[in-house]
């Protein structure tokens, strides 16, 4: 099996239903974290891992990727690395999405990385584990932080079960949404069908094939799965409870007040707040622990707390623990 991981596939085609109504305007991978699209954090880690090509799949609200890639849907670049796009008129899920870009893959294993997680995983360690394993796929795992559904035997480095389907008694770990797939797995995926990786992995395990894993507990890993978690990651960044390197080269990040944000002298800002470009906080308004997307407006006298005001929206009156 080939060693070098030359292609990265970033999964950006999901609906983001749990994050609605934020994802009514933009796809989940483009939801901003302190102004930076969520998928850009994955792209920055991938670029630092020296891959040679990045492929991104899209589905709903695909034109919003123009915000990050002005050339979309034409080929683009990220930090000098060629970026190709493949639109899915019908959502193909994870394994189906990978099969759908088979013609775009460079020879060798491919890194598959969810585009809607905030993570700083040690990708070179994942690559090394895969090269050593001789497995069809190597999963990046964590000991905690979400559903523990992958049975994993650490002494052998092999996955023994997924979602309890096989009945293994091995300790359970979290699958991070990041893995390395060997080309030998691709023939097991039928073309043109919506299919997740889980049944593909289970079929391989039942056939006696090796699926490997590596536990990567260092660095941040967050699934921004709902509005509460979206607010929480901003609160943690503001307090310093969480640190993550800037995904923008030669740029200070996070920035809490973006260019063009306007705050009336009689308005009050309490706690942490992220103020997007050209947003407006009007006279007598109070904003606390909230996120104002670009072009949003808090009306005079409004009281906004623990809320998100989406792009171009108006917040008036009492706005608490909600999305406008």
Label each residue range with its predicted role.
Residues 137-152:
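Short beta-strand-to-loop element that shapes/binds the nucleotide-sugar donor at the catalytic cleft/hinge
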Residues 206-286:
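Extended, small-residue-rich solenoid/repeat segments and analogous flexible loops
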Residues 283-324:
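Glycine-rich hexapeptide-repeat left-handed beta-helix
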């Amino acid at each position: 099996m080939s060693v070098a991981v030359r292609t990265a596939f970033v999964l950006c085609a999901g609906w983001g239903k749990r994050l609605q109504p934020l994802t009514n305007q933009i796809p989940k991978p483009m939801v901003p974290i302190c102004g930076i699209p969520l998928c850009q954090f994955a792209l920055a880690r991938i670029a630092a891992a020296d891959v040679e090509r990045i492929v991104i799949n899209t589905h709903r609200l695909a034109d919003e990727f123009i915000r990050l890639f002005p050339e979309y849907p034409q080929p683009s670049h990220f930090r000098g690395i060629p970026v190709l796009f493949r639109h899915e008129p019908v959502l193909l899920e994870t394994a189906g999405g990978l099969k759908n870009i088979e013609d775009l893959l460079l020879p060798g294993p491919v890194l598959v990385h969810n585009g809607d997680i905030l993570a700083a995983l040690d990708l070179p360690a994942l690559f090394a584990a895969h090269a050593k394993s001789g497995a069809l796929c190597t999963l990046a795992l964590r000991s905690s932080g979400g559903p523990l559904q992958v049975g994993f035997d650490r002494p052998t480095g092999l996955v023994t079960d997924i979602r309890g389907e096989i009945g293994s008694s091995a300790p359970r770990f979290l699958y991070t949404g990041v893995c390395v797939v060997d080309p030998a797995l691709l023939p097991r995926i039928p073309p043109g069908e919506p299919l997740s990786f889980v049944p593909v992995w289970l079929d391989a395990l039942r056939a006696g094939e090796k699926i490997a894993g590596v536990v990567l507990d260092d660095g941040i890993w967050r699934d921004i799965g709902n509005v509460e978690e979206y607010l929480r990651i901003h609160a943690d960044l503001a307090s310093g409870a969480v640190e993550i390197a800037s995904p923008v080269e030669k740029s200070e990040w996070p920035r809490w007040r973006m260019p063009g944000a306007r705050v009336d002298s009689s308005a009050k800002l309490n706690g942490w707040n992220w103020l997007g470009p050209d947003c407006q906080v009007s006279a007598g308004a109070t904003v606390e622990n909230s996120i104002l997307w670009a072009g949003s407006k808090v009306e005079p006298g409004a009281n906004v707390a623990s809320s998100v005001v989406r792009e171009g929206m108006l917040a008036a009156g009492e706005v608490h623990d909600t999305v406008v």
